[in-house]
């Protein structure tokens, strides 16, 4: 167990004056929420505008959090994996119309989920009273629809377990291993280094060596947690730093990975009051601005926020080795503005 030091131990560079208040906010957020290691990067106009590193990246309080510190980025893997899958489809390596039932275990997974108490399986309501539809196991489901979280019907329902079957469906239809797809279509062209696509990635570089171990606060003390053993799926599994995620972000916006027209479709898509989910991104409108974002949550182990404001060419990426960044987002409503970190960033 590790006691959180009383003082905030920020290891940030000299942020531009305009980001100084946000820098201070993150330092206070870390201390108030007992987060050992927290890293953040802001991208603006295709360049790194600011970086902040706070706390310690080990369990002895001896290794300061730095640009090298890596985290399990949880579900912020999804937009990265989805982008790679889109690029692979454009290159003719797979069809977006392939059936999810090309995964021989998908039918059994759907049957189990639809009868489970899990809301995105058997249905229910979110905390606002919005309907969460049950999975429709009789409905033919394509890879394209799964990338849009349509396993439960016409409207999106965030269903990470079904999404995690994507790589199996691609392989079952004769496609390449997802790790190879993401490495070739995203990581390499974006210039990402020290990125482990799951624990077993032979090309992960120093990602595992620089990993900040997970913690969970219990009665005012930080208790080190067992690392999850899940490998790499389209839903989660990447281990990297915010700085390397920023390289993905810059390449994504510049059209290096997929054509700009596909990005414009996300920005210009008509969405309802609950927002939408398309190609690995939550879509949300806030004060006249289209937001593309994703959250990440490893229960009692880590959390993440990846938020884009395309109209301002602005991006925020935050990773932490506790679940403090997570805010229990609805399964059927995009509401990143409910996140204290996102709200402060958007209001700056």
Put a short name on every predicted segment.
Residues 106-114, 186-197, 269-276:
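Short, mixed-charge aromatic SLiMs
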Residues 19, 44, 56-177, 216-219:
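Active-site-proximal loop and beta-strand segments within enzyme catalytic domains
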Residues 8-10:
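Cleavable N-terminal signal peptides
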Residues 1-6:
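Bacterial N-terminal signal peptides
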Residues 121-131, 202-228, 232-234, 282-284, ...:
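Carbohydrate-binding/catalytic loop surfaces
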Residues 89-90, 151, 170-174, 186-194, ...:
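Hydrophobic/aromatic-lined pockets within catalytic cores
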Residues 12-53, 102, 176, 180-184, ...:
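Catalytic loop of the DD-peptidase/beta-lactamase superfamily, centered on the K-T-G motif
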Residues 142, 159-164, 174, 180, ...:
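Mid-domain, small-residue-enriched loop/turn segments at the edges of structured enzyme/sensor domains
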């Amino acid at each position: 167990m590790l006691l959180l030091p009383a003082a905030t131990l920020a290891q940030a560079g000299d942020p531009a004056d305009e980001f100084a208040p946000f820098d201070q906010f993150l330092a206070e957020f870390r201390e108030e929420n007992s987060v050992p290691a927290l890293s953040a990067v802001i991208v603006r106009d295709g360049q790194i505008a600011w970086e902040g590193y706070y706390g310690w990246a080990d369990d002895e309080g001896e290794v300061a959090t730095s640009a090298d510190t890596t985290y399990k980025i949880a579900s912020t893997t999804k937009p990265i994996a989805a982008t790679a899958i889109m690029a692979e489809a454009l290159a003719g390596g797979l069809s977006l119309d392939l059936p999810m039932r090309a995964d021989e275990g998908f039918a059994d997974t759907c049957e189990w989920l639809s009868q489970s108490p899990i809301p995105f399986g058997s249905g229910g309501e979110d905390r606002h009273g919005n309907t969460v539809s049950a999975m429709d196991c009789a409905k033919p489901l394509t890879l394209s629809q799964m990338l849009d979280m349509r396993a439960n019907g016409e409207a999106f329902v965030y269903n990470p377990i079904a999404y995690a079957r994507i790589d199996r469906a691609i392989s079952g239809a004769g496609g390449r291993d997802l790790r190879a797809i993401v490495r070739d279509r995203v990581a390499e062209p974006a210039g990402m280094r020290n990125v482990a696509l799951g624990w077993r990635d032979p090309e992960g570089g120093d990602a595992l060596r620089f990993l900040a171990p997970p913690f969970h606060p219990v009665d005012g003390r930080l208790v080190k947690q067992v690392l999850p053993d899940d490998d790499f799926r389209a839903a989660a599994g990447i281990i990297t730093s915010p700085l390397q995620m920023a390289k993905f972000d810059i390449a994504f916006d510049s059209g290096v990975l997929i054509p700009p027209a596909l990005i414009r479709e996300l920005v210009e898509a008509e969405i309802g009051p609950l927002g939408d989910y398309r190609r690995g991104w939550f879509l949300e409108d806030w004060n006249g601005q289209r937001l593309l974002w994703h959250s990440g949550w490893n229960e009692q182990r880590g959390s993440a926020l990846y938020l884009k404001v395309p109209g301002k060419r602005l991006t925020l990426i935050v990773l932490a080795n506790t679940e403090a960044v997570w805010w229990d987002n609805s399964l059927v409503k995009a509401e990143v503005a409910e996140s204290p970190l996102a709200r402060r960033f958007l209001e700056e």
